[in-house]
Amino acid sequence: MFLGQEYRTRWGALDRRRMNAAAEAFFRDSWQLDINPRRLIRDLSLAERKLVQIARALIDGAAKLVVFDEPTAPLEAQEASLVSSAILRLREQGIGILYISHYLNEIAALCDRGTVLRNGEVVGYPDRALLQDTDALIKMMVGRDIEQLYTPRQSSAQQVDAAAPVLSVRHLSDGVHLNDITFDIQPGEIVGVAGLLGAGRDVLVDLLYGLRRARSGTISIDGQPKRLRTPYQATRAGMALVPRDRRHQGLILPFSTADNINLASLAETATFGWEHRGRALAKARSWIEQLSIRPGRPELPVRFMSGGNQQKAILARWLGTDARLFILDEPTLGVDIGARSDIYQRTRELADRGRGVLVSSSDAPELLGLCDRILVMWRGELVANLPTRGLTLDALLVTINGGQEQQV
């Protein structure tokens, strides 16, 4: 909290006692929180770490305006509520807030007025009343109605039910977190995986892509059993993964956008291990244009891009491959509504081309709008297999929260 603004004794040494007392008083007086200032950052929750960041900007009492850029993106709902409450108290203290977020419910709850940007230009200045109208706000942000967010399918997986499944999982277990998981994905089918935190969604994805070892069960691609002990083996078997943590699992942040896009198809842009830079840049430019990745500069380090454009760069990496199964793990986490629309459209196009798609997401409306079927997990087991036609959001949420098992 005091980095760069340390309290010191008259002899120049760090006055830790005074800094600890000031930090403790700040948390207590500003937010009515009891946080021990002597605790190590690594031992704090994500929400507490975020509060420390906020406190560092405010501890000297000089700040009149605080800019928050996606402050709750990595947080669970309860943690996000804690941070939002702290921000509201700042407003009550007369501090100006500039709040940047793609979470529309937070914008509606926290902000008095807004500014909407699309493709780098201002398209509107919604007042507080309009901020409460999610449908109107999404239309302003995306340029079309919310009903058009999930593009219609050109084909249906039901037409190819006689074909061998793209993915066939039988009695998959890891001995700890998952037990006896069995399901298929047909060519051209989008299958969602839903479940509460800790239900096993992330473990299932890791087992399928060779990030964890299965203790029992089989995984088959196009009817052929595969041993998937590493991501390399999974990729060779015809799988592609868009991971849940793009910054740590999906991107090489210092590398350019072009380098990240071409990672899965280096053979197309190199000869005997030597890269043809012009060929690599041309391939990247093609995908940048097709997916509307902004800014459209293939040489720009990917760390400077927004979360939505980073996610589209990872998706572009796999679209040019011959992968048969696409695993999308939290594909729109931390992604703005415009990028979401592009990702949904590309996902539907993959299915229309006969690829299988597995979408693991904590966003129930997303699964309902995007998928043909939804697998629901509960405490490491598959408890429901729900066709989305005719399925309501309320019924899905009841099942996710431990409701009645159906059609397993």
Regions found by a protein language model. Name each.
Residues 1-408:
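Glycine-rich phosphate-binding loops of nucleotide-dependent enzymes
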